[in-house]
From Swiss-Prot:
Residues 1-23 form the signal peptide. It comes from Rattus norvegicus. Gene3D superfamilies: 3.10.450.10. This is Secreted phosphoprotein 24. The lineage of its organism: Eukaryota, Metazoa, Chordata, Craniata, Vertebrata. Keywords: Disulfide bond, Phosphoprotein, Secreted, Signal. The gene is Spp2. The keyword Phosphoprotein applies. Its main location: secreted.
Length: 203
């Protein structure tokens, strides 16, 4: 068992040496860059939020890194934010306590952060409510500007994709067509009653 483990480790080391020697782009970025990207993403969310309170990240994960050159890269992150007790004027939400309660606003967010030499150059972010029970109208109230700005920059987001539910529009149209083609049951019932009265009057 130990011999097999040693062979696996040796093969792994040799493989990494091969990729580095063959000119494969290996970017050893500082872990602090990830924290900078997350902080910039949360700041972007708070700048576009219409809530009177600041949001703070609860969980985060790095989904993809696109290396543009030796100094510039683009990070794609996914994270969740929750409303804190600090007002917008507080500035930094990192030390703010989370609000308590059943209906505290929590959102799932995606961001694309462009960094150069360890410094944040540009940030794009988009959020949706983590709870499916929230309505689209309430989402627009707090994150109204973010959805519009995201759609405008869709073609520029190097590897950042947002999966919109394509079936919603078709579903709404089908309901509308059904409503136009078939009047409600009580109206059909009234029409039948009217015809019955007219026919009985001529008899």
């Amino acid at each position: 068992m130990e011999l097999a483990t040693m062979k696996t480790l040796v093969m792994l080391v040799l493989g990494m040496h091969y990729w580095c020697a063959s000119g494969f782009p290996v970017y050893d970025y500082d872990p602090s860059s990830l924290q900078e990207a997350l902080s910039a993403s949360v700041a972007k969310v708070n700048s576009q939020s219409l809530s009177p309170y600041l949001f703070r990240a609860t969980r985060s994960s790095l989904k993809r890194v696109n290396v543009l050159d030796e100094d510039t890269l683009v990070m794609n992150l996914e994270f969740t934010v929750q409303e804190t007790t600090c007002l917008r004027e507080s500035g930094d939400p990192s030390t703010c306590a989370f609000q308590r309660g059943y209906s505290v606003p929590t959102a799932a967010c995606r961001s694309t952060v462009q960094m150069s030499k360890g410094q944040v150059k540009d940030v794009w972010a988009h959020c949706r409510w983590a709870s499916t029970s929230e309505s689209n109208s309430s989402e627009e109230m707090i994150f109204g500007d973010m959805a519009r700005s995201h759609r405008r920059r869709n073609d520029y987001l190097l590897g950042f994709l947002y999966d919109e539910p394509k079936g919603e529009q078709f579903y709404d149209r089908s309901i509308e067509i059904t409503r136009r083609g078939h009047p409600p049951a009580h109206r059909r019932f009234l029409n039948l009653q009217r015809r019955a009265r007219v026919n009985s009057g001529f008899e």
